[in-house]
A protein has these predicted regions:
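A structural signal for short, hydrophobic/glycine-enriched beta-strand patches
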Residues: 1-202, 208, 257-267
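A conserved mid-domain beta-alpha-beta active-site/ligand-binding segment of alpha/beta enzyme cores
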Residues: 187-255
Length: 267
């Protein structure tokens, strides 16, 4: 059993990974924050991506009320985690109705409508991984003639940096603005890892760890990663030594934490 001191080191390392992966380019999604950073109070498009915990729906709704974009899109078909997401949403929102085969975009749309009385402009319901989340979004915007020179990308914090790297490769003329759907810190409480606060639908700590750990090899630009030197899915990502060190220590302590991607939904 890990000592309190060892768990505190684990918490620090988890938070290092989380801070690196869960990027937010502005402190809040408001016109003022965008204007201070980019010189414009609105982006052309904001996209919420399936794969996020349910709290992403609240982030989108808050952004819509604030008016941070001209067009709002929810992106996400049905992938290998969608049934788990459906079950989680039914548990959290038993009065929310959606079809048994609903895509993640449709589920988020139902949630935003039911809880906030709001509706996104477009749904993209065919993509099944981060890679075609971006390419299908790009193609949908082009098909509808929607200008997109600036794009707010809002994804689960564990996958936010990957989403931005995908957009940099597939939409090179577009300014990506990252805003992860949540920001949490892991602490030690009663001899266990715990969250400082838990957003709606938050992963349990073991699942959160596997999601964080699985991202670093993907982002590593070598023959095994998703970057230009590997599978070619992403733009190059620099991984700081501090992040690499935290990942190495966590892997040594929790070798089970490395998840394997389902090849049907890789990307």
């Amino acid at each position: 059993m890990a000592s309190e001191q060892e768990l505190e080191q684990v918490a620090r390392d988890v938070n290092v990974l989380a801070s690196f992966l869960g990027t937010r380019d502005v402190p809040s999604l408001t016109p003022r924050a965008l204007d201070e950073r980019y010189g414009a109070a609105q982006a052309d498009v904001m996209a919420l991506f399936g794969g996020s915990i349910l709290a992403g729906g609240d982030v989108l709704a808050d952004a819509m009320r604030a008016g941070v974009a001209r067009t709002y899109v929810i992106v996400g078909g049905a992938g290998h985690t969608t049934e788990t997401f459906r079950e989680k949403v039914r548990e959290l929102c038993p009065d929310l109705t959606f079809a048994g085969d609903a895509t993640e975009a449709q589920i988020f749309s139902s949630y935003v409508s039911h809880v906030h009385g709001l509706k996104a402009d477009l749904l993209e319901t065919s993509s099944t991984n981060c890679g075609n989340n971006i390419t299908y979004l790009r193609d949908l915007l082009a098909d509808r003639g929607i200008p997109c020179k600036s794009l707010i990308l809002s994804q689960d914090a564990t996958m936010q940096r990957r989403m931005v790297a995908l957009a940099a490769k597939e939409m090179p003329g577009v300014l990506p603005i990252a805003f992860a759907t949540y920001s949490v810190r892991v602490t030690v409480r009663d001899g266990e890892l715990a969250y400082d606060h838990a957003p709606l639908g938050m992963w349990d700590t073991s699942r959160y760890l596997t999601l964080l750990m699985g991202e670093i090899p993907r982002l590593t630009d070598d023959e095994n990663g998703y970057g230009p030197r590997g599978k070619g899915f992403l733009a190059h990502v620099d991984i700081p030594m501090q992040v690499r060190g935290a990942w190495d220590r966590l892997l040594k302590r929790y070798p089970w934490s490395m998840r394997t991607a389902d090849p049907r939904y890789a990307g």
